[in-house]
Regions:
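Bacterial Sec-dependent signal peptides at the C-terminal "C-region" and cleavage site
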Residues: 12-25
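Positively charged, phosphate-engaging catalytic surfaces used for nucleic-acid and nucleotide handling
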Residues: 9
Length: 171
């Protein structure tokens, strides 16, 4: 047993070294290829600068997700419910923090930030500007509702129709 354990350590050490090198390379690549995304994210964190089309999308999502209620708790049947005006789950908070870390930003969000409308909107824009810089409103909304491949799922079509209906009323 001990020899297997020692052998597994000897084999694992080079793997961790190469994984760390891979992460460094990935981070360097991200920093060089997405400076615009990083600048946009810094603007989002530092101020409230967004364009009108983006704001109409986020407010349509807020209306569909929570009808504007910042204290909304959804999916109570699940172990961890979605919280706030945009119905954010802890996994989205982790994803936003991962994005910020990859981009070299020291800002981090906590799960309790989901209760804040301003911070929820900031998290949404960070996610959107990183993953959906050039995506359509439909793809953004369907992925927000259904996860990374949400735009491919039939169940997100009804969600998109609700968002689109609210968007059309705003325009």
């Amino acid at each position: 047993m001990k020899t297997i354990y020692i052998w597994s350590l000897i084999v694992a050490i080079p793997l961790f070294g190469s994984m760390a090198d891979y992460r460094k390379m990935k981070k360097i690549n991200l920093l060089h290829t997405s400076e615009v995304v990083q600048d946009t994210i810094n603007d989002i964190i530092d101020s409230n600068s967004v364009n009108i089309q983006d704001s109409s999308l986020v407010y349509s999502l807020i209306h569909v997700e929570s009808t504007g209620n910042d204290s909304c708790v959804g999916d109570r049947h699940l172990v961890i419910p979605s919280i706030g005006c945009l119905q954010i789950r802890p996994i989205m908070v982790r994803e936003v923090n991962r994005i910020l870390k990859d981009l070299g930003n020291t800002t981090r969000f906590k799960n309790k930030d989901r209760w804040s409308r301003k911070k929820s909107i900031q998290m949404f824009y960070i996610w959107k500007n990183f993953h959906h810089k050039e995506s359509t409103n439909e793809k953004i909304a369907r992925n927000w509702n259904g996860g990374p491949r949400g735009y491919k799922r039939k169940r997100t079509l009804q969600y998109w129709e609700k968002v689109q209906k609210k968007l059309n009323k705003q325009l």
